[in-house]
C-alpha cells in the first residue's frame, strides 16, 4: 500500500504593492420548477473583454465571514517555494480541509491523526499538540478551525468541540456535541457556529463551550460527505444543508429569518450525490452552485431567488463589483453580469491542454490583480487573464490533486496530496 501525504506549498513573491417535508402532488399540467439540464460545453463571446478596477484590500483569507475573496492584491513569478510535510488526511477531496490564517501572521492546520500544528508563513514550527485519545486518533478526525482573539476554536467530525490557546496550543476546555460536524466554522456574537451531519446548525459559547442555540433542518437518511458551508453578515448567519436548503438565522438566538429550498423533494432519494459549492456573500446576495448544473443568486434580505443560471460546478464562486465568476467541472470559465443575471462570457480554460488522457478537473480558483489562478486535480495551476479570459501561464505544483489556492501575507498557500 503506497503511503499518502499532504503538503503545504508556500509560493513567495516580490510585489510592487503591498422546514419539514412537503408533499408533492403529481399534475400532468404542472410547470416544472426544478428542471434538469445538461452542462454547457461551448464558449460564448470568448473575445469579450471586461473591465475590473477594484482590488480587495487587507487579508480576505483572515477570518473572512463572507467567503468571498474578491480581487486580491497578489502577484508572483512562482520561483520560490517551501513545503511542510505531514501525514494522511482521509477523503481529502470531500472533506476539503482549510488552513486557518491567524491574526499573529501564522497558520494553523492538522495531521491525519488530529495533531494540530502552528507555523510561521515560511513554515518555521511554533508548536504541535494532540488532544485526542489513542482510540480517537485511529478514527482520523477532520478538524475545522476559527479564531476568537487569543484562542482557537476547534470542531471535528467526531462531535468534539474544544478551545486551545493560539500562543501555545494548550487546551482551554472541551465538550462533546451530539453529532459530528461537517462544515466550516465561523465566529459571531461571542459564539462559534457550525453545521453537523444531521443538518443541524449549532452555536457554542467561545468562553466555555456551552451550547447557546441550535436549529434543525431536513435531514436525509443517507448522509452526504461533501463539506457544507456558512457565512455571516451583521447579526445573521446563512448556511446551506446537504439537500440544498439555504437558511438565514438570527445569530443572537437562532430564530428563523427565512429559508429557501433549491431542490425538489425527490432529492431525498439521492441526496448523497448532491455537491453544493461553498456559499458566499456579496452585494446583499448569497451565491452558490452545484453539480446538478445550477447556479443560484438569492437575495440575502428576503430569501427570494434573484436569478438562476446553468453552471455545473461545486467550486466556490467569486464576486468582484458586478461580475460573478465561476468555473464548471468541464473547465469553462463563466462571467455573469450580476445586475441582470445574464452570462456575459464563457471561456474554455482547457483548450490549450494537449494531453487529456486523464480526466482533468478544476478544484478551485482565486482572482488576484485581474488574474485567475485555477488549481487542478492533476497538480497543475493555470494562470488566466480575468479581463480577456486568455491563458497566461501553466505551473506544475505536484503530480496529483491540489486544493484551491489561499493568499496570505504576500504568499500563496496550496494543500496538495501526493
How would you describe each model-predicted region?
Residues 117, 162, 202, 211, ...:
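WD40 beta-propeller blade core
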Amino acid at each position: 500500500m503506497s503511503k499518502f501525504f499532504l503538503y503545504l506549498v508556500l509560493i513567495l513573491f516580490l510585489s510592487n504593492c503591498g422546514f419539514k417535508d412537503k408533499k408533492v402532488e403529481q399534475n400532468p399540467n404542472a410547470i416544472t420548477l426544478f428542471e434538469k439540464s445538461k452542462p454547457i460545453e461551448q464558449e460564448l463571446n470568448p473575445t469579450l473583454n471586461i473591465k475590473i478596477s477594484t482590488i480587495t484590500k487587507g487579508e480576505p483569507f483572515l477570518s473572512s465571514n463572507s467567503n468571498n475573496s474578491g480581487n486580491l492584491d497578489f502577484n508572483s513569478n512562482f520561483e520560490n517555494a517551501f513545503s511542510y510535510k505531514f501525514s494522511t488526511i482521509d477523503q481529502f477531496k470531500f472533506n476539503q480541509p482549510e488552513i486557518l490564517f491567524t491574526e499573529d501572521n501564522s497558520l494553523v492546520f492538522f495531521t491525519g491523526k488530529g495533531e494540530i500544528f502552528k507555523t510561521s508563513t515560511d513554515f518555521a514550527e511554533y508548536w504541535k499538540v494532540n488532544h485526542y485519545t489513542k482510540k480517537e486518533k485511529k478514527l482520523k478526525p477532520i478538524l475545522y478551525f476559527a479564531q476568537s482573539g487569543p484562542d482557537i476554536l476547534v470542531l471535528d467530525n467526531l462531535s468534539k468541540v474544544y478551545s486551545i490557546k493560539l500562543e501555545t496550543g494548550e487546551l482551554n476546555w472541551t465538550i462533546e456535541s451530539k453529532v459530528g460536524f461537517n462544515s466550516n466554522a465561523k465566529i459571531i456574537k461571542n459564539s462559534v457556529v457550525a453545521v453537523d451531519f444531521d443538518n443541524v446548525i449549532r452555536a457554542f459559547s467561545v468562553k466555555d463551550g456551552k451550547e447557546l442555540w441550535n436549529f434543525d433542518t431536513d435531514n436525509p437518511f443517507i448522509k452526504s460527505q461533501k463539506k457544507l458551508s456558512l457565512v455571516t453578515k451583521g447579526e445573521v448567519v446563512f448556511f446551506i444543508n446537504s439537500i440544498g436548503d439555504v437558511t438565514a438565522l438570527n445569530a443572537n438566538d437562532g430564530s428563523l429569518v427565512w429559508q429557501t429550498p433549491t431542490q425538489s423533494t425527490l432529492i431525498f432519494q439521492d441526496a448523497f450525490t448532491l455537491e453544493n459549492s461553498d456559499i458566499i456573500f456579496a452585494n446583499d446576495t448569497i451565491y452558490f452552485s452545484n453539480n446538478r448544473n445550477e447556479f443560484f443568486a438569492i437575495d440575502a434580505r428576503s430569501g427570494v431567488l434573484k436569478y438562476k443560471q446553468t453552471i455545473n460546478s461545486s467550486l466556490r464562486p467569486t464576486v468582484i463589483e458586478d461580475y460573478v465568476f465561476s468555473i464548471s467541472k468541464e473547465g469553462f470559465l463563466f462571467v455573469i453580469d450580476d445586475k441582470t443575471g445574464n452570462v456575459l462570457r464563457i471561456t474554455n480554460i482547457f483548450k490549450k491542454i494537449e494531453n487529456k488522457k486523464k480526466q482533468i478537473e478544476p478544484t478551485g480558483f482565486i482572482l488576484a490583480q485581474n488574474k485567475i489562478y485555477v488549481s487542478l486535480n492533476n497538480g497543475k495551476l493555470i494562470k488566466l487573464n480575468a479581463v480577456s479570459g486568455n491563458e497566461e501561464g501553466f505551473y506544475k505544483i505536484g503530480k496529483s490533486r491540489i486544493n484551491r489556492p489561499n493568499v496570505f501575507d504576500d504568499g500563496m498557500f496550496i494543500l496538495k496530496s501526493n
